[in-house]
Every structure is written in structure tokens, then in C-alpha cells.
UniProtKB/Swiss-Prot annotation:
InterPro entries: HAD-like_sf, HAD-SF_hydro_IIIA, HAD_sf, Heptose_bisP_phosphatase, Histidinol-phos. This is D-glycero-beta-D-manno-heptose-1,7-bisphosphate 7-phosphatase. PANTHER family: D-GLYCERO-BETA-D-MANNO-HEPTOSE-1,7-BISPHOSPHATE 7-PHOSPHATASE. Pathway: Nucleotide-sugar biosynthesis; ADP-L-glycero-beta-D-manno-heptose biosynthesis; ADP-L-glycero-beta-D-manno-heptose from D-glycero-beta-D-manno-heptose 7-phosphate: step 2/4; Bacterial outer membrane biogenesis; LPS core biosynthesis. Belongs to the GmhB family. SUPFAM superfamilies: HAD-like. It comes from Pseudomonas aeruginosa (strain ATCC 15692 / DSM 22644 / CIP 104116 / JCM 14847 / LMG 12228 / 1C / PRS 101 / PAO1). GO terms for molecular function: D-glycero-beta-D-manno-heptose 1,7-bisphosphate 7-phosphatase activity; magnesium ion binding; zinc ion binding. Its cofactor is Mg(2+); Zn(2+).
């Protein structure tokens, strides 16, 4: 199972990101080819889980019902392509709330590992920010940076040692399915 578990950040990896937050279902727009990439991985036997910071809830920009609608849309679009999305975990807290789940802390990644009963060592965690990559390193996941979302900006910062870099999630899927 561990070799076939992939963990993804959401905003900037699966869907377009915004510095103003994704606040409505209409603003949740998949990155071209990301839905197909998840479906391809799922069809090949991969479990694709999601770990996403959603501080917009703590900030009052949207509520849990809106977040759940976005995740239902994600699951629906992937299912239409013949795939499945695994566990989706989110941190609803703000940056100053002192929780253990908000990336770069690795709480959400640990939760996914516990859910699937796997050691996270070597599991790929795909993100577009330094926080994603640092969370990956904290639990010995393989940090993977995509150039979508904030990825190009992130390239200008010091990356954790051994970070793999891909153009987008479709390129990650192609590499894993070779």
C-alpha cells in the first residue's frame, strides 16, 4: 500500500489558487489535466489523498458546507474520469491558532498515514509551497514541488534537500506511472 499512496496539497496543485482564497464553489476551478491525472493514478491502483490548509474557515471567508461542496465537486469530477479520491483532510485553523495540523506542521500527513496504516517514509507529498515541502520533510515523505499555483514563486526559495520538481500534477502522474 505505501508505494501506491500519493498525498496532494489542494489549492495550487489540484485547483487554481488565489491569494484572496477560494471562497465559493464557483471559484474552485481545477487546473487543466489535474483531474485526469488523479483519475489515471487511481485507475492504476494508487490511493490519492489530500491534505489542505483551509484557514479561510477560521477567517470567516467561507464555512464548512462550502468546503465540503468543493470536495464533493472534486470527487465527482474524478469519478466522471473513472477514478477515486481517497481521504481528504483539512486544517480549518488560522496561522496563529497554534494547532498541530496546519502545514508546515505535519499533523494532516500523520493523520493520513494513520488512516491507511502506513509508514510515511518515502511517500510522495506534492505541493506548491515551502510549507508543503517542510511538512513532507517533517515525516520523511518525499517532497515534490509542482510549478502550478505558488510553485514558481517557491522555486525562488531554498528548497528542502532532495525535493523533486515537476511542471504540474499530470507530469507527476506520468513519472509515477512509468
Amino acid at each position: 500500500m505505501s508505494r501506491s499512496l500519493l498525498i496532494l496539497d489542494r489549492d495550487g496543485v489540484i485547483n487554481l489558487d488565489s491569494d484572496d482564497y477560494i471562497k465559493t464553489l464557483d471559484e474552485w476551478i481545477p487546473i487543466p489535466s489535474s483531474i485526469e491525472a488523479i483519475a489515471r493514478l487511481s485507475q492504476a491502483g494508487w490511493t490519492v489523498a489530500v491534505a489542505t490548509n483551509q484557514s479561510g474557515i477560521a477567517r470567516g471567508y467561507y464555512d464548512l458546507a462550502v468546503l465540503e461542496a468543493m470536495h464533493a465537486r472534486l470527487r465527482e469530477l474524478v469519478a466522471e474520469q473513472g477514478g477515486e479520491v481517497g481521504l481528504i483532510v483539512y486544517c480549518p485553523h488560522g496561522p496563529d491558532d497554534g494547532c498541530d495540523c496546519r502545514k508546515p506542521k505535519p499533523g494532516m500527513l500523520r493523520q493520513i498515514g494513520e488512516h491507511y496504516g502506513v509508514d510515511l517514509s518515502g511517500i510522495w507529498f506534492v505541493g506548491d509551497s515551502i510549507g508543503d515541502l517542510e511538512a513532507a520533510r517533517a515525516v520523511d515523505c518525499q517532497p515534490v514541488l509542482v510549478k502550478t499555483g505558488k510553485g514558481v514563486r517557491t522555486l525562488g526559495k531554498p528548497l528542502p534537500e532532495g525535493t523533486l520538481i515537476f511542471d504540474d500534477l499530470a507530469a507527476v502522474a506520468s513519472a509515477l506511472l512509468q
